[in-house]
């Protein structure tokens, strides 16, 4: 594919080549509205100097440094989340945003706190995914005292201390998973729920919603003891195989967090595609294939692009402002996928 030329950019912007040249080289002042139109067109057509254009267009805006602490860098979902954070940072038009993304492969308080301190040394606001530990709350409180706002994403933590939460209403997510299983199961019977850890408030709320739906609306189903999978495919695979052996009359299960790849492989291994009602979290290449093969009944997904745009806006707004400048919770509508809309 031919690389877009300056003429292509002028055509896409609806301005002359001379105007594009002025924006690129900053020789003469161009109206802000026109400069932004040229930049947006450059981004949309993949113009090679889009980085330079951004620098020219937004050079007078404040510079904000934002830190992000994510989990498990090898997982498809977190890779997608990182890409969307970068894109949202680059697309922000109220300030120039530099995003620093770090990962932690261990969910221990010490590992999380170490990364938070690293991010705090370089950034003005921080967002993190993690379990809710008292030690982490204490660290978030220390950051707050230093004027560094912390936001929880996907799973809430440090309630009353963190600046805000951006993610799904996890209780509703759990109830929706239960609703699907109750409707899709071949008959009433035993159902199970996997959580990554009881320290993940988001998983706990999903479990609460899952159980409450069955208790209120489908009492003829039996919800088994909750299974811990540490969000790893290996543990989830083994736990699913054991679950199916111990309860051959199982009619469905829900993986509320990570590790669904192991559950999917276990259902395939046991030849149970189409025989169980299975709900997983997030749409990834693995869950998409499982939906197509009738291994998974439904995937409940986070609108990652919307989450990142909202998060960047709230984080930049929080810098240098009072605590009530941003909402305490920002719930996003979740996406639902079945075999018919992937």
Regions found by a protein language model. Give the residues of each.
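N-terminal helix-turn-helix DNA-binding module of bacterial transcription factors
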Residues: 1-54
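Flexible loop/hinge segments that line or gate small-molecule binding clefts
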Residues: 133-172, 284-292, 296
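Hinge/cleft segment of the Venus flytrap/periplasmic-binding protein
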Residues: 214, 303-342
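Hydrophobic alpha-helical segments within soluble ligand-binding/sensing domains
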Residues: 61, 165-191, 236-237, 287, ...
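Amphipathic helical "hinge" segments at domain boundaries
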Residues: 49-114
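Hydrophobic alpha-helical
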Residues: 126-143, 210, 228-286
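Proline-centered loop/turn at the N-terminus of a beta-strand
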Residues: 125, 147-151, 164, 190, ...
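Hinge/beta->alpha junction and helix N-cap segments in small-molecule ligand-binding domains
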Residues: 71-77, 100-111, 132, 166-175, ...
């Amino acid at each position: 594919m031919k690389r877009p030329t300056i003429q292509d950019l002028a055509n896409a912007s609806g301005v002359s080549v001379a105007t594009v040249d002025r924006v690129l080289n900053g020789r003469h002042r161009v109206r802000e509205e026109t400069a932004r139109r040229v930049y947006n067109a450059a981004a949309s057509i993949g113009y090679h100097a889009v980085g330079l254009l951004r620098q020219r267009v937004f050079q007078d805006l404040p510079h904000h440094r934002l830190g992000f602490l994510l989990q498990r860098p090898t997982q498809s979902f977190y890779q997608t989340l990182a890409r969307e954070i970068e894109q949202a940072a680059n697309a922000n038009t109220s300030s120039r945003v530099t995003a620093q993304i770090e990962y932690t492969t261990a969910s221990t308080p010490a590992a999380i706190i170490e990364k938070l301190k690293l991010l705090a040394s370089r950034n003005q606001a921080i967002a993190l995914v993690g379990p809710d530990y008292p030690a982490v709350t204490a660290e978030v409180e220390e950051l707050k005292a230093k004027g560094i706002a912390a936001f929880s994403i996907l799973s809430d933590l440090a309630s009353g201390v963190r600046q805000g939460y951006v993610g799904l209403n996890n209780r509703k997510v759990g109830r929706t998973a239960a609703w699907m299983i109750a409707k899709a199961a071949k008959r009433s019977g035993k159902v199970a729920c996997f959580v990554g850890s009881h320290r993940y408030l988001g998983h706990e709320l999903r479990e609460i919603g899952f159980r409450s739906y069955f208790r209120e609306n489908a009492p003829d189903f039996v919800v088994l003891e909750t299974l811990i999978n540490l969000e790893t495919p290996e543990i989830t695979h083994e736990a699913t195989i054991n679950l199916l052996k111990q309860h051959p009359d199982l009619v469905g299960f829900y993986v509320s967090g990570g590790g669904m790849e192991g559950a999917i492989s276990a259902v395939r291994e046991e030849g149970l595609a189409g025989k169980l009602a299975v709900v997983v979290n997030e749409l990834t290449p693995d869950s998409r294939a499982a939906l197509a093969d009738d291994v998974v009944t439904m995937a409940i997904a986070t609108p990652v692009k919307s989450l990142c745009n909202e998060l960047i806006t709230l984080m930049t707004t929080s810098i240098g402002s009072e605590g009530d400048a941003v909402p305490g919770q920002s719930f996003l509508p979740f996406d639902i996928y079945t075999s018919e809309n992937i």
